[in-house]
Amino acid sequence: MSGSGDREILLIAHPGRAEIVETAHRAAKIFTEAGIGLRVLADEAPSTRFDSRAEPAPVTGPAGDAVRVVEHSAAAAVGCEMVLALGGDGTFLRAAELARPASVPVLGINLGRIGFLTEAEAEHLDEALGQVVRGDYRVEDRMTIDVTVRVEDEVVESGWALNEASIENASRMGVLEVVLEVDGRPVSAFGCDGILIATPTGSTAYAFSAGGPVVWPELEALLVIPSNAHALFARPLVTSPESRIAVESVATGHDAIVFLDGRRTLALPRGGRVEAVRGSEPVRWVRLDSAPFADRMVRKFQLPVTGWRGRRRTESTRADRDQD
């Protein structure tokens, strides 16, 4: 829930969505009428028509100027109550890049397809933003992973991810030969197309497609999922959130690339080493409802549940039998 004082929200929007202008301006109207300021990034202002050269003109409200254009930098979300992401999971991940260093939460409104990271669908925009205006929401922290690339024991690159770090063959040709290490001990060596290190949040993303388990977000853990491995033992692993995962690329093999959430990359030369640990900072999440994760998974993935009777019906049947 928000604190007292001036309230301001940073808007991040998917520029390729036809409905984004209408949705963004609807959000601006709701917030400004409630006295809440809105920030937009300078490089997004033209596509959302929040610059002085575009129509419709920015709306105004009790807060004065409806929209404040800010530069796209690590400080863009500093001082905001939250970051509002209008789009799909990719937009949410982009918003998280700005929200995390500012330690502010992200609220995702789905304008995409699945939108597993988002909290509400576009048709429920007014209701969702109404809850924000009233401060009727809670914030939960989701663990991240910090990733480091070492070459000859020297740190050469580092980054972080909310969903996963995906280590892949840079040339896309041949097999990537790796050695997996957990907590300082070797576990297995194998050839593969790649290997993922994921969080519970990322278990419903790329890791899900690669055959990894779905992990409830309340459970903190690190997941290791080999992709198309050529080995008898190369199964998905679930480790402690405090584990230190390392993947070494053999010196005679291929150069590799580490994709962080599919958005940022680190170079892994042959003979290099990737280390992943629990992130130093979480990504903070705006939650508007308390629906069970199972319900969310069924809804987002459109899972069939026909035939489910549930405990209530079972208990009533037992009660009828007891009376007989």
UniProtKB/Swiss-Prot annotation:
Class of this enzyme = transferase
Q: Which UniProt keywords apply?
A: ATP-binding, Cytoplasm, Kinase, NAD, NADP, Nucleotide-binding, Transferase
Could you say which residues bind NAD(+) here?
A: D89, G90, R94, N163, E164, D193, T204, A205, Y206, A207, F208, S209
Report the locations given in the UniProt record: Cytoplasm
The primary location reported for this protein is cytoplasm
Does Nucleotide-binding show up as a keyword for this record?
A: yes
Q: What's the catalysed reaction?
A: NAD(+) + ATP = ADP + NADP(+) + H(+)
Which positions are catalytic residues? Answer: D89
Q: What's one GO MF term for it?
A: metal ion binding
Q: Which InterPro entries match?
A: ATP-NAD_kinase_N (IPR017438), ATP-NAD_kinase_PpnK-typ_C (IPR017437), NAD/diacylglycerol_kinase_sf (IPR016064), NADK (IPR002504)
Which cofactors are reported in the record for this sequence? a divalent metal cation
Please state the Enzyme Commission number of this protein: 2.7.1.23
GO terms under cellular component: cytoplasm
Instruction: Give me any GO biological process, just one.
Output: NAD metabolic process
This protein's source sits in the domain of life called Bacteria
Query: Which Pfam families does its entry note?
Result: NAD_kinase, NAD_kinase_C
Does this entry carry the keyword ATP-binding? yes
Q: Which SUPFAM superfamilies match?
A: NAD kinase/diacylglycerol kinase-like (SSF111331)
Q: What does this protein do?
A: Involved in the regulation of the intracellular balance of NAD and NADP, and is a key enzyme in the biosynthesis of NADP. Catalyzes specifically the phosphorylation on 2'-hydroxyl of the adenosine moiety of NAD to yield NADP.
Give the family this protein belongs to, as stated in its UniProt record: Belongs to the NAD kinase family.
What HAMAP family does the record tag this protein with? Answer: NAD_kinase
Q: Which protein is depicted?
A: NAD kinase
Q: Which organism is it from?
A: Nocardia farcinica (strain IFM 10152)
The major lineage groups are: Bacteria, Bacillati, Actinomycetota, Actinomycetes, Mycobacteriales
Q: Which gene encodes it?
A: nadK
